[in-house]
Amino acid sequence: MKDVTDENRQNSENAIKTYVSVAFKIAASAIFAALVAAATLLFVIPIPATSGYFNFGETLIYIAALLFGPLVGAIAGAGASIADALVAIQYAPGTFTIKAIEGFLVGFLFKKIKAKTKSITLSATVAVVVGGLEMVAGYFLYETLILGYPFALAALEVPFNIVQMLIGLVVAVPVMHAVLRVFPQLKSQF
């Protein structure tokens, strides 16, 4: 009888942990989507040729994806479209898709590479670079195929997007390490 009671208690504790984990991820998704939108709006360097802009929301997408995984990363990425809906509406649909895919890719690749290499820094770096390159290619294709910008005009934004990715990488990886030192329990996410 005692074994059944212990098993029931363990099942209840696991159910509570799962519920808390799901609730925590939902909250983290909402918070990061809002933070990405705010960072995208507050720290802006316009690119007049394309009506696009350089911003620091990228960094928060990477942090969300690295710490909480692909789904939180995707939702955080989609948060950037909130900013575009306010300041560059023509980019909002593309941003929703491009940044959501970017956040998902970073979180997904980080988990997969980390499982094989055991190196958090290498895994994070590769994941961010691949996700960032998806963002660069995604905006280039969106501007040429959807917005109808000439190839040369869309190409003007490529270096800005690469710098945005690199700044995000240089900031996000150390921040991830710092957060994991303070909250080591987050390592269970990956």
Where are these regions (language model features)?
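Loop-helix junctions at membrane interfaces
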Residues: 1-190
